[in-house]
Amino acid sequence: MTQLQSLRGMVDLLPEQTRCWQAVESVARDHFRRAGLQEIRTPLLEVTELFARGIGEATDVVGKEMYTFVDRGDRSCTLRPEGTASVVRAALQHGLLSQGPQRFWYGGPMFRYERPQAGRQRQFYQIGVEYLGVGSPRSDAEVIALAWALLVDLGVQGLVLEINSLGTLQDRQKYREELVAWLEARSEELDDDSRKRLYTNPLRILDSKHPAIKELLQDAPTLFEALSVESKARFEEVQVDLEALQIPFQLNPRLVRGLDYYGHTAFEITSDQLGAQATVCGGGRYDGLVEQLGGAPTPAFGWAFGMERLMLLLEAAASINPSGSAARLRASTRPDLYVVNRGEQAERVALVIAHQLRAAGLVVELDSSGAAFNKQFKRAGRSRATWALVIGDDEAERGEGRLKYLQEAKTQANPTPIDKLHRLDDVTGLVCLVRE
């Protein structure tokens, strides 16, 4: 009798490999917990329309790579090829967006019918983050910083962060016309794949791996040149915030994402540890997706990384340490601190201090909404955080923050609520005070 084998591109994880995966998952969970994210789990199987509407029918994912079938109820069903559309669908279906901004993370298998190779399988595992309802450039930097800090903590070597702005839909339509006209004049130099994409999804030609196409595109107009003044100003704010966080980055005007829902900030984190520069993590802003799926216009930003490629990088760097990772975990999901902030200078200072306090081990939730202080305090109360750190422009100017105890403060030993100023440059002292 013929021995049964797993399907091509569907790989077993044996116990030794599983232990390594669990170590990575534990570190990721710890980072997400400290950033105030909540886990969400969605079905592997969705109606095909979700991905056709969300990802875009002209994309390679929808056109070539999805596992789709008609079930016994005569419905077209698809094994999820990515996680974002499912998370947004769940948030809409259960009315979560009516409760204010939502911060989710997820992990699980995805499915795409593509040629299997090292670090790429037909069933692959992704871990991702989705921030729904927050539209500030500062939140872009915060979410990118979360990905960067996680990969650095895991020990991935040779990391490079590349960023670009895809602008608004109007910006991209303007650029699409310019790019198509430029490529039409050089159609004889295009390969077959690029010719197919020229009128269906021309921006994806910018992501071509064909050496001749990459060389041809060196002289092509860039999307950045087509951006509006407002889009350029927004992108500049993201760069300033990344610099404030001391996260190195490179501008890549050719960087595009493979899914239609992206706009404004897009990014990829790559590593050269496997020889060629390989993408470890990618994502960006997708403000139009919620509306495309039937909701109200809602800003959103997210990213995901593939576990298979990440594990290859960790093996190459010999940097996986399960016992060290597991030792840092703590059971509680209650934030230690909720950062309330308002004002241009205060928001940037708050972004930096939240990043520093998370690095020091605190569970910190940063309010990036720019809402009035009273609304932020209501959210702080709902978060069940022990403390609130309040930073306005006046406090930021003085390098101070007001620390408020949010739990029951009136006791015999302490009859009045704790409300004190603290130097923001004294991170160690702030951590000690919060942990008292």
Curated annotation (Swiss-Prot):
Query: Can you tell which superkingdom this protein's organism belongs to?
Result: Bacteria
GO: which molecular function terms? ATP binding; histidine-tRNA ligase activity
Q: Which reaction does it catalyse?
A: tRNA(His) + L-histidine + ATP = L-histidyl-tRNA(His) + AMP + diphosphate + H(+)
PROSITE patterns noted in UniProt: AA_TRNA_LIGASE_II
Enzyme Commission number(s) from the entry: 6.1.1.21
Indicate the quaternary assembly. Answer: Homodimer.
List the subcellular locations. Cytoplasm
Q: Which organism is it from?
A: Prochlorococcus marinus (strain MIT 9313)
Q: Which gene encodes it?
A: hisS
Q: Which InterPro entries match?
A: aa-tRNA-synth_II, aa-tRNA-synth_II/BPL/LPL, Anticodon-bd, Anticodon-bd_dom_sf, His-tRNA-ligase, HisRS-like_core, HisRS/HisZ
What are the GO cellular component annotations?
A: cytoplasm
- Example of a GO biological process term: histidyl-tRNA aminoacylation
Protein name per Swiss-Prot or TrEMBL = Histidine--tRNA ligase
What are the entry keywords? Answer: Aminoacyl-tRNA synthetase, ATP-binding, Cytoplasm, Ligase, Nucleotide-binding, Protein biosynthesis
State if ATP-binding is listed as a keyword: yes
In the record, the note on similarity to other proteins reads:
Belongs to the class-II aminoacyl-tRNA synthetase family.
